[in-house]
Regions:
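Short, small-residue-biased leader/transition segments that mark boundaries at the very start
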Residues: 1-12
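Non-heme Fe(II) oxygenase catalytic core, chiefly the N-lobe of the double-stranded beta-helix
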Residues: 10-227, 232-261
């Protein structure tokens, strides 16, 4: 809208940041923004990622990931996840802008990891308080290698070299709000450190089932020109892939670190 032509003042940016910390996900409909504004808005929160190692980018803007799905390129994020937790320092936030939205389907779900933690039984909270878990690339490796040729093998190996896996505390404390939250996700969390495979699988299976309850979720129906920002530290999300063979095009900028942390 017209706000991009006059810029966003520091007071307004601070209010958006404070609301993000409180509500975890913010939605702004009918925002006719330019790619330049998208990048500058994301930069107001912290340093941004460029370019993404897998996905293509918007022409002239290597910082903006182009997420384009249709019958020839079906979606691959239709499972619960927190972005790239297989890295030692996962990103702080994502700023996603809708360009082309199918008439039916293509919603996105978010869930609050702090609300999930708060709802856990006290005995289970005590059990997991000091546990750590291994996060690896999981099915994300399919983005690197979707055939058997040598180029894909090289790309996959480079992905393992860059990301490998990471170990994170199962329970974390938000650096700004001080809320505790459950830091695992079905896509990338593979093993509880120090547990047998059987015990680890049983615990993770219980927690994953608990985390996916609709009571902790919000479901958002996209319209074109909608801007959404979420705190990747304490949320999971799920992009529903129910719109094939129709087309869905999104632009995403990833904020690596929290400028105010």
């Amino acid at each position: 809208d017209s706000s991009q032509s006059r810029g966003l003042g520091d007071v307004y940016k601070r209010q958006i940041y404070d609301d993000l910390i409180q509500y975890k996900v913010l939605f702004f409909r009918e925002q006719n923004i330019t790619p330049q504004f998208h990048v500058e808005f994301a930069k107001s929160f912290g340093s941004i990622e460029e370019p993404h190692p897998v996905y293509p980018h918007v022409d002239g803007f290597p910082e903006i990931v182009l997420l384009e799905n249709d019958k020839d390129n079906p979606p691959d994020t239709d499972e619960w996840h927190t972005d790239v937790t297989f890295k030692n320092d996962p990103p702080f936030a994502s700023v996603l802008y809708s360009k082309i939205i199918p008439e039916v389907g293509g919603d996105t779900l978010w869930s609050s990891l702090s609300k999930i933690y708060d709802a856990l039984p006290h005995e289970l909270k005590a059990q997991i308080e000091n546990l750590r878990a291994i996060h690896d690339m999981g099915s994300f490796r399919n983005n690197y290698m979707n055939d058997d040729n040598k180029e894909s093998s090289i790309k996959l190996n480079k992905g393992f070299e860059e990301f490998g896996n990471a170990v994170h505390s199962v329970v974390k404390v938000h650096p700004i709000s001080s809320e505790k939250f459950l830091y695992i996700n079905p896509s990338f969390t593979s093993q509880i450190v120090g547990m047998t495979t059987t015990d680890s699988n049983n615990l993770l299976s219980y927690l994953f089932n608990f985390m996916c309850k609709p009571e902790f979720q919000i479901r958002f129906k996209w319209t074109p020109n909608t801007l959404v920002i979420w705190d990747n530290r304490c949320t999971m999300h799920y992009a529903i892939g129910d719109y094939m063979p129709n087309k869905r095009v999104m632009h995403r900028v990833t904020v690596l670190n929290d400028r105010r942390d």
